[in-house]
């Protein structure tokens, strides 16, 4: 019976330590959010379909927390933004 109590206590302590480590990792990964609305307004300023462009840009910005600079191209500045694709394999982000 004593062995069972020691085993149970060590298991609970291990779980508690893992919970603290996980909580520390979650709070340390918070990056500051950018203003997607203004970045996408700039990105879509020359688009022939500004509403569609702004919606797609906003989705990409929310996922990647960055928007490629300028009105087109420059996907190398934000690799996540440039790598998102639609189901058809086309670029999702304007």
From Swiss-Prot:
Function of the protein: Gibberellin-regulated protein that may function in hormonal controlled steps of development such as seed germination, flowering and seed maturation.
PANTHER family the record matches: EXTENSIN, PROLINE-RICH PROTEIN (PTHR23201), GIBBERELLIN-REGULATED PROTEIN 1-RELATED (PTHR23201:SF2)
Swiss-Prot/TrEMBL keywords: Disulfide bond, Gibberellin signaling pathway, Secreted, Signal
Family membership noted in the UniProt record: Belongs to the GASA family.
Localization of this protein: Secreted
Any one Gene Ontology cellular component term annotated for this protein: extracellular region
Pfam family, one: GASA
Recorded name of the encoding gene: GASA11
Organism taxonomic ancestry: Eukaryota, Viridiplantae, Streptophyta, Embryophyta, Tracheophyta
Stretch forming the signal peptide: 1-23
Post-translational modification: Six disulfide bonds may be present.
Single GO BP term: gibberellic acid mediated signaling pathway
Name listed for the protein in its UniProt record: Gibberellin-regulated protein 11
